[in-house]
Amino acid sequence: MDSSTLSPLTTSTAAPLESYERIRNAADISVIVIYFLVVMAVGLWAMFSTNRGTVGGFFLAGRSMVWWPIGASLFASNIGSGHFVGLAGTGAASGIATGGFEWNALIMVVVLGWVFVPIYIRAGVVTMPEYLQKRFGGKRIQIYLSILSLLLYIFTKISADIFSGAIFIQLTLGLDIYVAIIILLVITGLYTITGGLAAVIYTDTLQTAIMMVGSVILTGFAFHEVGGYEAFTEKYMRAIPSQISYGNTSIPQKCYTPREDAFHIFRDAITGDIPWPGLVFGMSILTLWYWCTDQVIVQRCLSAKNLSHVKAGCILCGYLKVMPMFLIVMMGMVSRILYTDKVACVVPSECERYCGTRVGCTNIAFPTLVVELMPNGLRGLMLSVMMASLMSSLTSIFNSASTLFTMDIYTKIRKKASEKELMIAGRLFMLFLIGISIAWVPIVQSAQSGQLFDYIQSITSYLGPPIAAVFLLAIFWKRVNEPGAFWGLVLGFLIGISRMITEFAYGTGSCMEPSNCPTIICGVHYLYFAIILFVISIITVVVVSLFTKPIPDVHLYRLCWSLRNSKEERIDLDAGEEDIQEAPEEATDTEVPKKKKGFFRRAYDLFCGLDQDKGPKMTKEEEAAMKLKLTDTSEHPLWRTVVNINGVILLAVAVFCYAYFA
């Protein structure tokens, strides 16, 4: 939708114009400007205070992070603007069930910190495809998974965040969507390219604090406005729009009436929009893929100074994940109560008048609440929260995607690439991602209402389960080998992509216009499909592995659970093909005298973290000691006990939340 089609709508109705004008006051603008200045200052501080001149420094923050920035960064990387728009929108449409998606993470972060990360640390890996390459050997799995992960980042995570950020920017600022998003991406890319993972984690920590404070304040205002929690539960069930027919068309009652099970997480296994077996089992598969094998998440854990800090960071993230149900999902429901005709509209012409699309306006639930309910200054703070969540998610994706490209793809193309060349390649790939992000904006913008967001939720069900199956078996069953893992991934991908393409071709439809997609393909709920795909992938991996040659234990020490404490030296599969770039580097260091750099070259190197002249070069013995430290998973007994107790408490909190709202 271009600006020409928007202008008649904004002039014909007072509401959008009033929304734009509400934000244009000194208090709101001052808060937004101060926020962006603080974020840039934090990024610059990280740029000057951390070592970004090495791959480990730029991509893993030098493995020196403590628990609280890790926990905050895990949370901020997960909670993007897509959550504020998508979760609140789904809450407005169907109730609290999507909050169960968030609570599933409480269990999975414990699995991440106690099971998966110790294996990754002992393996001495930087990326997830690198782990599979060490575990199985060969190149095809590593390269396949790297490319698939990059595609998932570009066409799900980036597009979801830009789509939801676009909705918010249009509603609140009235800026041209392309101008606003390009400015955001430039600022985001700037401090990610210059600061590396340390800048991302520190800015994530700042943005998590802003998100929580702003959202808690909004929640207080919202519940006060509706008269408390009891009144909220009563009024939501009566939040029916005033216009429910147009012309000679009568809209079915189910399209505008709140669901009877709106305040239940566990819904009917057949008729429920989110069936309870799918939520319990299907969602667990998707959260296993996301929290335990996704580069964005695991990379933050690998930056911790020791395993206790990993576990404590996971626990902090888990406690924070309790909040989205109350701060986001229920806020969408409150928005439906307060602005029923706008948020819950069903008449196409009315919906187009309010939000520019004909199939529904639930996606504007959270932004509308912010613009209409918050006082000056606090409204600016909440806009900052939305921009913070958009930027933190994008920075996480940019940094992790460039890590995947640099470590798993570029090193295969340029086997003798120097450290400096790898750093430059990673930064250039980030610029490429930013370009794709901007090019993707019109595609995202042309998608009707929240349908693209719905697609994205289901895309993970079609592409994630085979990856989760392979990682799970790789860690817990040492008999799995490379052919089994590869064909499990390939078959799972082919089945998943077939369902995805079919659904894209037919469309998901809407309440009034159901999709024509064949029931045998699209009739299976995407969470049930995830379970089926996961089981098929596991069977394929197991059968092919049993019919092919096993991997000797000498190649598996510290790569799987049963051999995690082994002290023997591991001989990597495909050893001898790696680590071939150091000799040429050393030769050039000794043979070629270094020229004195000019002022502008030194400033450029400092800005991009390419100044590698800090301190003497490590000896072979020092490098070996450093490698040993980076693969160390020992913990202080006291802190191990403290994090273990907190882990049990977190699991108990998860069980209580599910039971109370079941």
Swiss-Prot record:
The keyword Cell membrane applies. Residues 1-24, 91-95, 170-176, 222-275, 332-375, 445-451, 505-525, 661-662 are extracellular. GO terms for biological process: alpha-glucoside transport; D-glucose transmembrane transport; fucose transmembrane transport; galactose transmembrane transport; intestinal D-glucose absorption; myo-inositol transport; pentose transmembrane transport; renal D-glucose absorption. The keyword Lipoprotein does not apply. N-glycosylation is not necessary for the cotransporter function. One of its GO terms (cellular component) is apical plasma membrane. The chain crosses the membrane at residues 25-47, 67-90, 96-117, 140-169, 177-193, 203-221, 276-295, 310-331, 376-406, 423-444, 452-477, 482-504, 526-547, 643-660. Found predominantly in intestine, renal cortex and in outer renal medulla. Changing Q457W: Drasticly decreased affinity for glucose and phlorizin. It is a multi-pass membrane protein. GO terms for molecular function: alpha-glucoside transmembrane transporter activity; D-glucose:sodium symporter activity; fucose transmembrane transporter activity; galactose transmembrane transporter activity; galactose:sodium symporter activity; myo-inositol:sodium symporter activity; pentose transmembrane transporter activity; water transmembrane transporter activity. Pfam families: SSF (PF00474). It is linked to Mutation of Asp-28 is implicated in glucose/galactose malabsorption. This is Sodium/glucose cotransporter 1. It comes from Oryctolagus cuniculus.
